Amino acid sequence: WGGNVTFDDFCEYILPYRIGDEPLSLWRKDLYDTYNPLLDKFRKSADSNDIIKAAQILMDTLRQGKYRYTSLFPKGPHIGPVALKWKTGSCREFADAMIYVMRALGVPCGMDRVIQRGDTNASHFWNFILDKDRNTYMAEFPYQENWKKASEYDITKGKVYRVTYSLNEELTKELKDVPSVHPIFRYPFFHDVTATYLGQQNGQIVIPQKELYDCPRTGELVYLCFANKQEWVPVACTFFDGKAVCFDNVEGGIVAILATYNEKGLQTLSNPFTLNHDTGEIHYLNPLQESHIISVYKKFYFAVKNYFNTRMIGGVIEGSNQKDFQNVDTLLLIKEAPYRLYTVAYLNPDRAYRYIRYRGGKGSYCNIAELSFYENSLDTLPMKGKIIGTPGCYGDDGRREYTNVFDGNPDTSFDYKFPDTGWAGLDLGKSYRVSKAIYTPRNDVSFIYKDNIYELFYWDKGCWNSLGRQTAVADSLVYTVPQNALLYLKNHTTGNDAVSYTHLRAHETKA
């Protein structure tokens, strides 16, 4: 496959002796000697010029290890080739590990990233490789089984950049006369590859001057910013042409704001706005004088595609009088993703059952956090029984077994090791008519919790404005808020100003 790699790609995605700022080490020969034998048979096959197949062989082997995700690694230099040995870290460390192996074996591989996701409070990194026609294939190692085309990657990305060893000379030249450039763009070792991932979903943002409450000078650099908690993070930049601010190659499904940058930091120019993923329509979040009453169930709305709560769609609650559930009755089919901490379902069974369970839908990994059953619809104490289910969880570390479903803790969950056939239930000892079930989806501890203290804010002309604090008496809050406002909910009980569970989103609440 080496004959299909261009010289430029070789110099950028194979030759570099380091990914970024990691400590120097002599890693290439050791990794070549370790992983090269895996490709001996492949080199003799008819497909030996297929880069994707070579990369798949290597990834299949790398995925056999047990990896542990953690976001606790401090921000700073890359850790280097030890990422392969430790098998612990965030998406950045996992992407680094893949790059070292691929480059050692002559596969053009690198890292694509989003500086800030447009629908959740995180940046993200993943791997890419280039086929013989320079088409991009991507993988979220170690979770993704196969390399897939960039256009098939379906998370909300907003803007995508390819990390490079060389400086982006074109962008550097454009910014050389700007007196104060935001640190993210000051030394741009990256290129914009958003169009590679979006295809026909590639959008454009045009914000006319009339939507700016603080108009920049003609030719002044303006940043497109996405939200991270109470901060705004630049993800793209352009120059104001005197009439409008225009950004090409932006994916919809995001909340953004415009800002300039100087020695005092970011200075916002507009109120927030959304870009519709399907239509490309821009909606401005300018708070109105009119207010309305809303109920808040979660600290951010479920904009993230394939979020945990959606995995409950298609799940069923079943009853049986046989331990193996050979003869089973469906008591409830979950048709919608739950949006609150506790969802109550009334079952109205025709008969009594000794065994009752939740069985996850196809591809759900039986993701569920908590489940309780009640003999009568007015009961408040759940039924007791022997916990039964399918053993085994992702990572085989025992942290997300089926027993979590009945531990009374909505912050723990079941994550079955296979996408299908997982279930968790109770042996009640004898047959009962079960009239009610209450369930909680797997989650990131962002629901509303009783007795926690919350504060709701809305954004208007450059700052967050408080709508007051409340102590939750159930799994929801009620607020009167300005219509058409961007809202932000902060938990003062479990969070702190630095790493609080706070999320900024538009229309995240249910009226």
Predicted regions and their residues:
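Structured interaction patches on ligand/partner-binding surfaces of diverse proteins
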Residues: 262-289, 504
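Hydrophobic/aromatic-rich core segments of domains that either
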Residues: 40-61, 72-81, 86-87, 92-184
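Linear, non-domain "peripheral" regions
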Residues: 1-48, 271-273, 360-362, 500-505
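A short, amphipathic beta-strand motif
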Residues: 203-213, 502
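Short, ordered, surface-exposed loop/turn motifs in non-cytosolic proteins
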Residues: 212-230, 310-315
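Disordered, acidic Ser/Thr/Pro-rich linker "stalks" and the adjacent N-terminal cap
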Residues: 288-343, 348-352, 363-434, 440-449, ...
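Short Pro-Gly-centered beta-turn/loop motif in secreted/extracellular proteins
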Residues: 244-256, 261-263
